[in-house]
């Protein structure tokens, strides 16, 4: 009887865990849609709810991001720099290679007055994102990698910004604006690459079906 009860309890725990993860994913998708159209308050609410449901939730395949990166980035976009810093540091404590989180941590620090550490984090985030895009487009060039940053627009922008950081006179307003553009552009690229891959597969499938 004890063994049976234990099995039932375990099954219930697994079921509830799966439900929480599914609900978290639904909130993340809604949050991303809100975030990408600039509805930052709504995005923050969705991401925060997802973190409450499943604090270990990770989104994505090619560019994996934990939920605290999303909470922190949306908090930054609402101007809540204290919440942003806490969440972004938590994201990086879970995975130090969360380069979008690092980029936004740098932005948060810079806009909170700590430009010295801020520029280091921005630079580190940019370098990490560049390396990730290079890896995705090279290692997976025969699969989903061929749909990422196809014109090299993101990587070229990163190279220009890194050169600006290394220059003598750093234009902070431009760096912050460019970094915010980069953060959103990379997030958009997730959807664009997925869309292009899906359309390509549909064309291939349609072509095969039409063959005699």
Task: Describe the predicted segments one by one.
Residues 132-212:
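Terminal, low-structured helical/coil segments at or just beyond the last alpha-helical repeat
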Residues 51, 99, 107-134, 159-167:
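TPR/TPR-like (Sel1-like) alpha-helical repeat modules
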């Amino acid at each position: 009887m004890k063994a049976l009860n234990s099995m039932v309890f375990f099954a219930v725990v697994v079921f509830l865990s799966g439900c929480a993860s599914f609900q978290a994913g639904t909130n993340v998708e809604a949050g991303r849609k809100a975030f990408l159209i600039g509805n930052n308050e709504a995005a923050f609410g969705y991401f925060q709810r997802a973190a409450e449901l499943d604090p270990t939730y990770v989104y994505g395949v090619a560019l994996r991001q934990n939920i605290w990166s999303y909470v922190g980035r949306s908090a930054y976009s609402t101007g809540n720099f204290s919440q942003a810093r806490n969440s972004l540091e938590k994201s990086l404590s879970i995975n130090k290679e969360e380069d979008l989180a690092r980029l936004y941590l740098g932005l948060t620090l810079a806009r909170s007055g700590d430009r010295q550490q801020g520029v280091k984090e921005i630079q580190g985030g940019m370098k990490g994102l560049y390396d990730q895009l290079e890896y995705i487009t090279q290692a997976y060039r025969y699969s989903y990698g061929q749909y990422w940053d196809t014109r090299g627009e993101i990587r070229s922008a990163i190279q220009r910004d890194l050169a600006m950081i290394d220059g003598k006179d750093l234009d902070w307003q431009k760096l912050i604006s460019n970094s915010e553009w980069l953060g959103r552009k990379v997030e958009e690229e997730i959807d664009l690459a997925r869309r292009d891959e899906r359309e390509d597969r549909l064309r291939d499938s349609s072509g095969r079906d039409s063959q005699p």
